[in-house]
Amino acid sequence: MNLKDITDPSDFKTTKLPALAELDILKRCYICKDLLNAPVRTQCDHTYCSQCIREFLLRDNRCPLCKTEVFESGLKRDPLLEEIVISYASLRPHLLRLLEIEKVESKQEVDREKSANESASNGNRNVNNDVDETVRVKDQSNADELGEEKGQAQHGEQVNEQTTEVISLLSDDEENGSDSLVKCPICFERMELDVLQGKHIDDCLSGKSTKRTPTDILSPKAKRPKQITSFFKPTIDTKTPSPPTSKASTTPTATPTTTLLKANVSSPSPVAQSTVHKGKPLPKLDFSSLSTQKIKAKLSDLKLPTTGSRNEMEARYLHYYVIYNANLDSNHPVKESILRQQLKQWEMVQHQPSFGDAEWKGAETGNWKELIARARSN
């Protein structure tokens, strides 16, 4: 196994959401500290990997957490939790990547704010240096502005006279024709009733109406054909079938975040399709009541090797008994040939020569002396 494949809740401690480490811990087995694999629940409502708790119960029949007596026959599968853990395991690297991206972006924002503050402080220094020059320029421009203001005042008087005339006309029109003017319920503009019942309501509802100018209001009424807008007309049910909605239109638009989460994420199979297991669990043998020949016959029936001593054959059966029954607890069981391959690898590890503490110290003596010499030299 590659070291990069090893996960730990502390991976989230350096991200933008360090609290996700607690969520990661809840999805791990208390015995192996890895993400739950084929989780089962004990009678005391604690959850472990099926293989982990079965191997533990071979040595001790008490719960590792609360020390309550636990029986292997009372283990209950948790298929929903297994699918949740599988989904979380597939999303975990993408989640870490997204949180790391946000962390980098927030760091860039801090750098931009810092540079903006520095430029603002430099700008304040330049402003202080230019105050005297600005005062001199203003003194010179004041004389020119006095001449311009005289001309603008004369022009402003003419504009004010024209504006006063328009406002007075509008106010007179509102006072004299207040009985004939009505207010639009959409834009609250006052107008004649026939104008309101014409195209104005439709234009207001569709957003096409424009602001009426004083010229339009003050102009004499043109003879218009009396029309009733569709707003006041009774609705007629034509009973025309609506076109079927295409699936593409109802599909939500994918965002960069959802695209990243969907990339390389395989959706697990439904729980209902994977909870059916045809195999039967293997029984736990009482080796004290079985002869060596019967043990060999049991191994032969399971297509397992019958070589080695009696103790080796008993250990072989017990380990296969654990991984076989744990495989039945999984939503995604593997073939028996793969289980036999796992058993073979396990036996190879068990037959490796043991490396004691004394031998390890002797082999590493040279390295220890070199490290001590480096520490003293520093």
Curated annotation (Swiss-Prot):
<keyword id="KW-0863">Zinc-finger</keyword>
<dbReference type="GO" id="GO:0003697">
    <property type="term" value="F:single-stranded DNA binding"/>
</dbReference>
<feature type="binding site">
    <location>
        <position position="200"/>
    </location>
    <ligand>
        <name>Zn(2+)</name>
    </ligand>
</feature>
<dbReference type="GO" id="GO:0005634">
    <property type="term" value="C:nucleus"/>
</dbReference>
<keyword id="KW-0539">Nucleus</keyword>
<keyword id="KW-0808">Transferase</keyword>
<dbReference type="GO" id="GO:0006974">
    <property type="term" value="P:DNA damage response"/>
</dbReference>
<dbReference type="GO" id="GO:0097505">
    <property type="term" value="C:Rad6-Rad18 complex"/>
</dbReference>
<dbReference type="GO" id="GO:0008270">
    <property type="term" value="F:zinc ion binding"/>
</dbReference>
<dbReference type="GO" id="GO:0006301">
    <property type="term" value="P:postreplication repair"/>
</dbReference>
<dbReference type="InterPro" id="IPR003034">
    <property type="entry name" value="SAP_dom"/>
</dbReference>
<dbReference type="InterPro" id="IPR017907">
    <property type="entry name" value="Znf_RING_CS"/>
</dbReference>
<keyword id="KW-0862">Zinc</keyword>
<dbReference type="InterPro" id="IPR004580">
    <property type="entry name" value="Rad18_fungi"/>
</dbReference>
<keyword id="KW-0227">DNA damage</keyword>
<dbReference type="InterPro" id="IPR039577">
    <property type="entry name" value="Rad18"/>
</dbReference>
<feature type="binding site">
    <location>
        <position position="184"/>
    </location>
    <ligand>
        <name>Zn(2+)</name>
    </ligand>
</feature>
<keyword id="KW-0238">DNA-binding</keyword>
<dbReference type="Pfam" id="PF02037">
    <property type="entry name" value="SAP"/>
</dbReference>
<dbReference type="InterPro" id="IPR013083">
    <property type="entry name" value="Znf_RING/FYVE/PHD"/>
</dbReference>
<keyword id="KW-0234">DNA repair</keyword>
<feature type="region of interest" description="Disordered">
    <location>
        <begin position="233"/>
        <end position="256"/>
    </location>
</feature>
<feature type="zinc finger region" description="RING-type">
    <location>
        <begin position="29"/>
        <end position="67"/>
    </location>
</feature>
<keyword id="KW-0833">Ubl conjugation pathway</keyword>
<comment type="pathway">
    <text>Protein modification; protein ubiquitination.</text>
</comment>
<feature type="binding site">
    <location>
        <position position="204"/>
    </location>
    <ligand>
        <name>Zn(2+)</name>
    </ligand>
</feature>
<dbReference type="InterPro" id="IPR001841">
    <property type="entry name" value="Znf_RING"/>
</dbReference>
<comment type="subunit">
    <text>Interacts with E2 UBC2, forming a complex with ubiquitin ligase activity.</text>
</comment>
<keyword id="KW-0479">Metal-binding</keyword>
<feature type="domain" description="SAP">
    <location>
        <begin position="287"/>
        <end position="321"/>
    </location>
</feature>
<feature type="compositionally biased region" description="Polar residues">
    <location>
        <begin position="117"/>
        <end position="129"/>
    </location>
</feature>
<feature type="compositionally biased region" description="Low complexity">
    <location>
        <begin position="245"/>
        <end position="256"/>
    </location>
</feature>
<comment type="function">
    <text>E3 RING-finger protein, member of the UBC2/RAD6 epistasis group. Associates to the E2 ubiquitin conjugating enzyme UBC2/RAD6 to form the UBC2-RAD18 ubiquitin ligase complex involved in postreplicative repair (PRR) of damaged DNA.</text>
</comment>
<dbReference type="GO" id="GO:0061630">
    <property type="term" value="F:ubiquitin protein ligase activity"/>
</dbReference>
<protein>
    <recommendedName>
        <fullName>Postreplication repair E3 ubiquitin-protein ligase RAD18</fullName>
        <ecNumber>2.3.2.27</ecNumber>
    </recommendedName>
</protein>
<dbReference type="GO" id="GO:0006513">
    <property type="term" value="P:protein monoubiquitination"/>
</dbReference>
<feature type="binding site">
    <location>
        <position position="187"/>
    </location>
    <ligand>
        <name>Zn(2+)</name>
    </ligand>
</feature>
<dbReference type="Pfam" id="PF13923">
    <property type="entry name" value="zf-C3HC4_2"/>
</dbReference>
<feature type="region of interest" description="Disordered">
    <location>
        <begin position="109"/>
        <end position="162"/>
    </location>
</feature>
<feature type="zinc finger region" description="UBZ4-type">
    <location>
        <begin position="181"/>
        <end position="209"/>
    </location>
</feature>
<dbReference type="InterPro" id="IPR006642">
    <property type="entry name" value="Rad18_UBZ4"/>
</dbReference>
<comment type="similarity">
    <text>Belongs to the RAD18 family.</text>
</comment>
